[in-house]
A protein has these predicted regions:
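Conserved GNAT-fold acetyl-CoA-binding loop/helix
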Residues: 16-41
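Conserved beta-strand in the GNAT
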Residues: 54, 60-68
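Conserved active-site alpha-helix within GNAT-family acetyltransferase domains
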Residues: 97, 121-140
């Protein structure tokens, strides 16, 4: 039976494996550059910036959901769901829904003003999941912007 629990420091190597698996699925295998040390410190160091729930079954972690707190000047603190990952072989068994339901409970418990996340426009299974179970709003008006570390370093002061 699948149990949902809070992630612990010892889960980090497995979580990073799953993150790499997701990057391959999302056609970006070389984009995962975070080290295990940095990842672990960021979640379990003196000032954690992310939190996770893991799905565990018979000592194996087939999935997890990771979030951080985002601040909106209009709405206050919101949960930002960075990743919800379930291994390909474990999909279709309700693990994603168990994780998402637990994340929703966390958002309620922490009194966040809402939840936000992104989904790739071609990822139909994920889009259908969020529509089917959660009637999520999809906002086509906003465009994601970013600067890479290299771009930041190249910008003059």
């Amino acid at each position: 039976m699948v149990q949902i629990r809070r992630g612990v420091k010892e889960d980090c190597p497995r979580l990073l494996e799953l993150i790499t698996e997701l990057a391959i699925y999302e056609k970006a295998p070389n984009e995962v550059t975070v080290s295990l040390e940095h990842f672990t410190e960021s979640g379990f160091g003196k000032n954690p910036v992310w939190w996770a729930f893991v799905a565990e079954e018979n000592g194996i972690i087939p999935g997890f959901g990771l979030y951080y707190i985002r601040y909106s000047t209009w709405k206050g603190q919101r949960m930002y769901l960075e990743d919800i990952i379930v291994t390909e072989e474990a999909r279709g068994r309700g693990i994603g829904k168990l994780l998402m339901d637990r994340l929703i409970e966390e958002a309620k418990e922490k009194k966040f003003s809402g939840m936000m996340w992104q989904v790739l426009e071609w990822n139909e299974p994920a889009i259908n999941f969020y529509k089917k179970y959660y009637n999520a709003n999809f906002d086509p008006e906003w465009i994601n912007c970013m600067l890479s570390k290299d771009q930041l370093m190249q910008l003059s002061r």
